[in-house]
Amino acid sequence: MLSSCGGHGHGNPRSLQEEHHGRCGEQQGGGGGGGQEQEQDGFLVREARASPPSPSSSSFLGSTSSSCSGGGGGGQMLSFSSPNGTAGLGLSSGGSMQGVLARVRGPFTPTQWMELEHQALIYKHIAANVSVPSSLLLPIRRSLHPWGWGSFPPGCADVEPRRCRRTDGKKWRCSRDAVGDQKYCERHINRGRHRSRKHVEGRKATLTIAEPSTVIAAGVSSRGHTVARQKQVKGSAATVSDPFSRQSNRKFLEKQNVVDQLSPMDSFDFSSTQSSPNYDNVALSPLKLHHDHDESYIGHGAGSSSEKGSMMYESRLTVSKETLDDGPLGEVFKRKNCQSASTEILTEKWTENPNLHCPSGILQMATKFNSISSGNTVNSGGTAVENLITDNGYLTARMMNPHIVPTLL
């Protein structure tokens, strides 16, 4: 709109000082004009009444111009035509997007400016009483991707399809890339699965089967009797480990002279060799000597012969012990052929198996006898062996050299 004050039909503007108190009484109209002058706040304002634009033969999607009809001068309404006469809207098929970007004014974005022009065209058709084309009623879908505005994906689409989708209950997603065609990365791909236990293979129990062996055992039973048993055992070979025993892979000679000096409170280390061809060594646990109530008795064996019936493996025993210099009852014993017996077969089977080998150093001379109920004496190679049974039920045996001890009890 244009505001002017005319004088004498020439339309020359007055100065502000003259217009402040002056009043223009004449009205100018040119060419059957429909102009009208009003006084607002001391100013003469000429309102131009625009006639409704006649729709041209071409569509409004092209370049259109709207002008106000008025004599001499007229106000110009919102025009969408470009100065050079090109398609200003850019909404037609031949429209240029660069023209839209060139006309962007104010704080509007190119998309908002296109929407504003689109609504202005619809309004112009309504104001001209012209039917609005269907192309304007349909939403305009125009991509701005070549100029840097990509198409916005819908909310259901993934903006970063190659990124791990795990959020771990937080606002932000995992920053790692997904594995292959999966949704998650290597860290989160197995997060929701149940962890299965690892398969544990059962340990195979290996049994060492050896040939039957023979063990001569002399031990103290729960009743206090010295028992010598001989058993034939068939089965697996057991190894009893002892930190004080020495194992060797060499074959022990049967006729080995061992000189030991014994003490009542000493412990013995026995090692036995099996009769099998591989000559494996079996380390036996040591036995302690007991000395109670001034009565000394020695229990020797390949294991404790308790009433539980624990299996005793039988083999030839060889006494290996460090030499003790000082012993109150120590004597020098030589390995000789002797005969061992138990309390059950003391009188019946005394003469059987005369060739059994008895280990040296397993008999100890008793220090005191209260009373003797029965006794047996066997002479073998100048060595006297006397088996005595005391009133307490202990079977004791003493072996002495007749040259050293001339008399017996």
From Swiss-Prot:
<dbReference type="InterPro" id="IPR014978">
    <property type="entry name" value="Gln-Leu-Gln_QLQ"/>
</dbReference>
<keyword id="KW-0010">Activator</keyword>
<dbReference type="GO" id="GO:0005524">
    <property type="term" value="F:ATP binding"/>
</dbReference>
<feature type="region of interest" description="Disordered">
    <location>
        <begin position="1"/>
        <end position="81"/>
    </location>
</feature>
<feature type="compositionally biased region" description="Gly residues">
    <location>
        <begin position="1"/>
        <end position="10"/>
    </location>
</feature>
<feature type="domain" description="WRC">
    <location>
        <begin position="158"/>
        <end position="202"/>
    </location>
</feature>
<dbReference type="GO" id="GO:0005634">
    <property type="term" value="C:nucleus"/>
</dbReference>
<dbReference type="InterPro" id="IPR031137">
    <property type="entry name" value="GRF"/>
</dbReference>
<feature type="compositionally biased region" description="Low complexity">
    <location>
        <begin position="56"/>
        <end position="68"/>
    </location>
</feature>
<dbReference type="InterPro" id="IPR014977">
    <property type="entry name" value="WRC_dom"/>
</dbReference>
<keyword id="KW-0539">Nucleus</keyword>
<feature type="compositionally biased region" description="Gly residues">
    <location>
        <begin position="27"/>
        <end position="36"/>
    </location>
</feature>
<comment type="function">
    <text>Transcription activator that plays a regulatory role in gibberellin-induced stem elongation.</text>
</comment>
<dbReference type="GO" id="GO:0006351">
    <property type="term" value="P:DNA-templated transcription"/>
</dbReference>
<dbReference type="GO" id="GO:0006355">
    <property type="term" value="P:regulation of DNA-templated transcription"/>
</dbReference>
<feature type="short sequence motif" description="Bipartite nuclear localization signal">
    <location>
        <begin position="163"/>
        <end position="173"/>
    </location>
</feature>
<feature type="domain" description="QLQ">
    <location>
        <begin position="107"/>
        <end position="142"/>
    </location>
</feature>
<feature type="region of interest" description="Disordered">
    <location>
        <begin position="221"/>
        <end position="242"/>
    </location>
</feature>
<dbReference type="GO" id="GO:0032502">
    <property type="term" value="P:developmental process"/>
</dbReference>
<protein>
    <recommendedName>
        <fullName>Growth-regulating factor 8</fullName>
    </recommendedName>
</protein>
<feature type="short sequence motif" description="Bipartite nuclear localization signal">
    <location>
        <begin position="191"/>
        <end position="198"/>
    </location>
</feature>
<comment type="similarity">
    <text>Belongs to the GRF family.</text>
</comment>
<keyword id="KW-0805">Transcription regulation</keyword>
<dbReference type="Pfam" id="PF08880">
    <property type="entry name" value="QLQ"/>
</dbReference>
<dbReference type="Pfam" id="PF08879">
    <property type="entry name" value="WRC"/>
</dbReference>
<keyword id="KW-0804">Transcription</keyword>
